[in-house]
A protein has these predicted regions:
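A short loop-to-beta-strand structural motif that recurs across blades of beta-propeller domains
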Residues: 91-94, 148-151, 194-197, 253-257, ...
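Sec/Tat signal peptide C-region and signal peptidase I cleavage site
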Residues: 26-32
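Bacterial N-terminal signal peptides
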Residues: 15-25
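Surface-exposed loop and turn segments in beta-propeller and other repeat-based domains
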Residues: 34-50, 99-120, 128, 151-171, ...
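Beta-rich, blade/repeat-based domains predominating
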Residues: 46-72, 88-90, 112-131, 136-139, ...
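N-terminal secretory signal peptides that target proteins for export/translocation
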Residues: 1-9
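Short loop/turn segments immediately following the C-termini of beta-strands
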Residues: 80-82, 135-138, 145, 155, ...
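Blade-level signature of beta-propeller repeat domains, shared across WD40, Kelch, NHL, RCC1
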Residues: 333-370
Length: 370
């Protein structure tokens, strides 16, 4: 969108490290594990073509093949609007390494330029060496939206294949991955028809094959919205341990859970209600945090509160509110986010700000003091 607690005792995620450089012949000391200043990077998401309104966010996972334009630990961001701020006209995925120089507006590195406009929050990276991104074009920047597609891109930013289907890929708005290397399940929220699909795919050297599509959930509210263009099912988060897929339904202002999502052969109606709270204000992006909690981005298109703009909300899978913070002092700034559990001390949490067309990336560490 482009418009200007108390919980159970368990690990919380707090920033603990800072970037320290080396000047002349002076050797920087080791970074203390209890450093106070967080390790944080904020950079523009605007590339040379002027695309704005960052939506999707994805870390490049461990095990991703070397030798391409992107590597493990890099961050990808998809842009929904063009330089004129027309919604559904953005065509770029930008990439950056959290250890590289901060990009000024207009200088963000372009990883992929699409011939299909309106790159959505549906952005993910497969360990087999491919990036998957959805697109949802608009009608002159407004409702109704068009069907769109999923595009598969190799590690050098080349388009490999385009997946379309009027039923199973009808406005691919967000996605979640269950990635097993040589095969994967891609869960897709369809904003145009209010459903969630699962794509079972084989991941090979040349792309995806043996693709089987199944609708696993239906009945989510779909409605036009001026600032957001359309409201419908958006964020998805998959818990591989339990087999549960969580769905952020923006129009319903609620989070639902689909049990046995990887094996379902028919569609449930919405799924089990997990979280419906005054803390929600049109949830968009949704991720499972390394501590087991869920994180969602409030888009402020529903239940808006000027005193609580652009918030990221943390809550448990049992529906208990934990914490919230705002990414911008204006409404409509929060959208895409990602969180990963890494083994090398890399940045592992990122969230975009649609108001400033930027992304903040953090290194968060587990602690048991909450």
């Amino acid at each position: 969108m482009k418009t200007k607690s108390k919980g159970r005792s368990r690990p919380a995620y707090v920033a603990v490290a800072m970037m320290i450089g080396v000047a002349a012949t002076v050797v920087a000391p080791a970074i203390a594990k209890d450093a106070f200043i967080p390790r944080l990077l904020n950079t523009s998401t605007v590339p040379s073509n002027g695309d704005v309104n960052p939506y999707g966010v994805a870390f490049v996972p461990e095990g991703f093949p070397e030798g391409g334009m992107i590597k493990t630990g890099d961050v990808l961001v998809s842009n929904f609007n063009d330089k004129g701020n027309t919604q559904g006209n953005g065509t770029t995925i930008i990439s950056f390494s959290p250890n590289s120089a901060v990009a000024a507006p207009g200088t963000a590195n372009t990883f992929f330029s699409s011939s299909l406009p309106g790159l959505s929050t549906a952005l993910g990276v497969l360990r087999g060496g491919f990036v998957v991104v959805g697109n949802v074009p608009t009608t002159g920047g407004a409702f109704p939206v068009m069907q769109g597609a999923l595009q598969v891109i190799d590690r050098n930013g080349n388009l490999v294949q385009t997946l379309t289907d009027a039923t199973f890929l009808d406005g691919p708005w967000d996605l979640a991955l269950d990635d097993h290397g040589t095969w994967a399940q891609i869960f897709v929220s369809n904003v145009a028809n209010g459903t969630v699909s699962r794509l079972d795919v084989t991941v090979g050297a040349k792309g995806l094959s043996n693709i089987k599509m199944t609708t696993i959930a239906k009945g989510y509210t779909v409605a036009p919205n001026g600032p957001a263009v359309i409201l419908g099912p958006t964020g998805l988060a998959f818990d591989a341990g339990s087999g549960t897929l969580y769905v952020a339904s923006t129009g319903d202002n609620s989070i639902y859970a689909i049990s046995n999502a990887g094996r379902a052969t028919s569609a449930v109606q919405l799924g089990r209600l997990v979280f419906a709270s005054s803390h929600l204000r049109g949830p968009l992006g949704l991720k499972l945090a390394p501590n087991g909690d869920l994180l969602t981005a409030n888009g402020d298109a529903v239940n808006a509160d000027p005193a609580h703009p652009s918030e990221i909300v943390e809550f448990t899978p049992w529906g208990h509110f934990v914490r919230e913070y705002n990414v911008d002092s204006s409404q409509g700034g929060a959208f895409g986010l990602d969180a990963v559990l890494d083994s090398d001390g890399r940045f592992n949490y990122a969230a975009v700000d649609d108001v400033t067309n930027s992304i903040s990336v953090y290194r968060l560490e587990a602690r048991d003091d909450r």
